[in-house]
Amino acid sequence: MKRKNNKFIEISIAFILGIALGLYGQNPDYFTNLISQKSLALSALQIKHYNISELSRSKVSTCFTPPAGCTKFIANQIDKAEESIYMQAYGMSDALITTALINAQARGVKVRILLDRSNLKQKFSKLHELQRAKIDVDIDKVPGIAHNKVIIIDKKKVITGSFNFTAAADKRNAENVIIIEDQELAESYLQNWLNRKASN
């Protein structure tokens, strides 16, 4: 009985494959166009390309751990914010960055944060400390994990990279941070932030 079932499956697959190849032979452009349309649709919705000449006009700074020091690098950028800070974070437990965000809120900077849901249960998360400071903090309810590490400052500067906003990222892990000062790029990141916020 098992052999008969296997034989039936093999014949069915061969039959379907034969039909597909026959259709492709008659009209190969249909399949090519279909794939191209799908790819173009994805690009239009999710992908923004930047060429080297565009980014070469931007001011770019980097930081790497080890050695420690990227936390201060990020906090200094937050201290320079004048109008707005939009943040996305997976881990949010660093005291220095939290203090910089609270100070920014206190001096009138608009601070908005999206965190991964794990912060609701993590012992060292600064979620509640940020909320007590009247900062608008929301949970990104993506089905998986909200793994972004992004800070958008004054809609013209983007901080991103592998660096979680935690003490471990600065003192124990091998991480990277990149800061790009480019208004168009910042607007692209901000639009993604707003889309994630709206989806919640």
Curated annotation (Swiss-Prot):
GO terms for biological process: lipid catabolic process; phosphorus metabolic process. Homodimer. Residues 142-169 form the PLD phosphodiesterase domain. It catalyses: a 1,2-diacyl-sn-glycero-3-phosphocholine + H2O = a 1,2-diacyl-sn-glycero-3-phosphate + choline + H(+). Gene3D superfamilies: Endonuclease Chain A (3.30.870.10). Keywords: Hydrolase, Lipid degradation, Lipid metabolism, Secreted, Signal, Virulence. One of its GO terms (cellular component) is extracellular region. It is found in: Secreted. The keyword Signal applies. GO terms for molecular function: phospholipase D activity; RNA endonuclease activity, producing 5'-phosphomonoesters. Belongs to the phospholipase D family. Its EC number is 3.1.4.4. Could be a virulence factor. It holds the Pfam family PLDc_2. The active site is at H147, K149, D154. The keyword Cell division does not apply. Its main location: secreted. Residues 1-25 form the signal peptide. This is Phospholipase D. The gene is pld. It is an enzyme of class 3 (hydrolase).
